[in-house]
Amino acid sequence: MLSVAKLFFMNNKITYRNSNQNIENNNSDSCAGSEFWSMEGKNVQLTWFDVPANTNFPNHKHDSEQITYVLERELFFKSGDTAYRLAKGDCILIPGNIDHEVWTEKSSARAIDAWSPVNKVYTVNKISLLNKL
């Protein structure tokens, strides 16, 4: 089963570009070039992100709860007046409908996000992992 999931995961790599994706309140191309892979079930989603250095996902919010786990290097998050620096092995929970900003500084980062319910912004296609197994 794991090999099927891995193949499905890797075959759905797409490049994130603001002109093709709509994040609420996002009016900049600063996150262009970030890549993600996504797989989803009926009510849960997992995304794997490769984010270049000096990338900014401007202040936004979404209905989904988000858990981010940093795999490599570091990511920065800000919500309200509070900023967080997450290094490899750190994770953060962002409740749904909370304004937040995410960015990298001098180095790229790699992270996994878990979403519930599915965040439609990062939906790759209509075929769920459950249908593939």
Language model region names:
Residues P58, I67, T82-R85:
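Short, surface-exposed secondary-structure edge patches
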Residues M1-N43, I127-L133:
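A short, N-terminal "cap"/entry segment at the start of jelly-roll beta-barrel domains
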Residues N43, E74-F76, A83, D99, ...:
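Structural motif
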Residues S64-E65, Y69-L75:
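Glycine- and acidic-residue-biased ligand/ion/polar-headgroup-sensing regions
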Residues D81-G96:
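Short acidic-glycine-tyrosine-enriched beta hairpin
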Residues N12, N43-Q45, W103-L133:
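Double-stranded beta-helix
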Residues T47-K61:
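Conserved short histidine dyad/triad with adjacent acidic residue
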Residues N59, F77-K78, I94, H100-K106:
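Short beta-strand His + acidic residue motifs that chelate non-heme Fe in jelly-roll/DSBH
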